[in-house]
């Protein structure tokens, strides 16, 4: 039994990060990059010709493992998996990697179906905790049609997710909320394939498949559905 459609898929390409933000919901960075075998095994659970509406690459800091972003594109092409749109967020610190990240995102944009409705996105995150964004990084990404500023956040107004390092921040100063994991909802096709039409299907850097993305590395264990390498 394989997946023939998924509304929202997330792939964590690395747990490494070049910042150490006090509010990070993941917790402390770890020297772990996703292995290609996890990407392959995860995508092998999809039918040939399956459809992913939205595919998001997360970290850590995604620019520290651009090869995994490209490898995923190669892997979906090999399996004939169509993708509606992609979404990527970088902190912009690694100026020397921004041009390559921009090129990788263009390769994805060329492959995705939804090119004209601004569904795709490559954003630089900015908030009260991040280091200043280098001008060079902004300049490199600014020419992309799908470069957006929707990850600019004022955490004196917005709520922090009370996960990871954010648990150590003073609740009298910062508003917090507990993470909410939407239920993975699915239905079966007439041929027995699975359509995950609601919720987030998340492949993390150690090959675990998790229900929900906005969780610390510790909390991901609680919502783990299994490992991509498990016998199918």
Predicted regions and their residues:
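Non-cysteine beta-strand/loop elements that form the S-adenosyl-L-methionine
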Residues: 114-130
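Hydrophobic "anchor" residues
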Residues: 208-209
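Short, small/polar residue-rich loop motifs at catalytic or cofactor-binding pockets
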Residues: 193-197
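Hydrophobic/aromatic residues located in beta-strands of well-ordered beta-sheets
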Residues: 55, 86-88, 122, 150-153
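Acidic (Asp/Glu)-rich catalytic clusters
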Residues: 45-49, 77-80, 103-117, 142-144
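C-terminal accessory region of radical SAM enzymes
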Residues: 149-182, 214-232
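Conserved alpha-helical substructure of the radical SAM core
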Residues: 1-88, 95-100
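Active-site beta-loop-alpha junctions enriched in small/polar residues
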Residues: 60-62, 91-93, 127-129, 157-164
């Amino acid at each position: 039994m394989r997946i023939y459609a998924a509304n929202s898929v997330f792939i964590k390409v690395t747990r490494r990060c070049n910042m150490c933000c006090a509010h990070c919901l993941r917790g402390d960075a770890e020297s772990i990059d996703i292995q290609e075998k996890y990407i392959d095994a995860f995508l092998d659970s999809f039918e040939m010709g399956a459809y992913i509406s939205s595919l998001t690459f997360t970290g850590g800091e995604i620019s520290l493992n651009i090869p995994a972003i490209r490898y995923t594109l190669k892997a979906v092409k090999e399996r004939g998996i169509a993708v509606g749109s992609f979404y990527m967020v970088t902190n912009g610190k690694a100026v020397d990697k921004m041009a390559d990240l921009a090129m990788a995102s263009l390769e994805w944009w060329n492959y995705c179906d939804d090119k004209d409705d601004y569904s795709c996105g490559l954003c630089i995150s900015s908030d009260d905790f991040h280091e200043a964004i280098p001008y060079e990084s902004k300049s490199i990404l600014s020419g992309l049609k799908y470069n957006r500023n929707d990850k600019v956040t004022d955490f004196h107004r917005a709520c922090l997710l009370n996960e990871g390092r954010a648990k150590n921040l003073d609740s009298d100063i910062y508003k917090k909320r507990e993470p909410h994991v939407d239920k993975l909802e699915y239905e079966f096709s007439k041929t027995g394939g699975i359509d995950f039409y609601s919720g987030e299907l998340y492949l993390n850097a150690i090959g675990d498949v998790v229900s929900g993305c906005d969780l610390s590395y510790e909390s991901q264990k609680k919502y783990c559905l299994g490992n991509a390498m498990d016998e199918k």
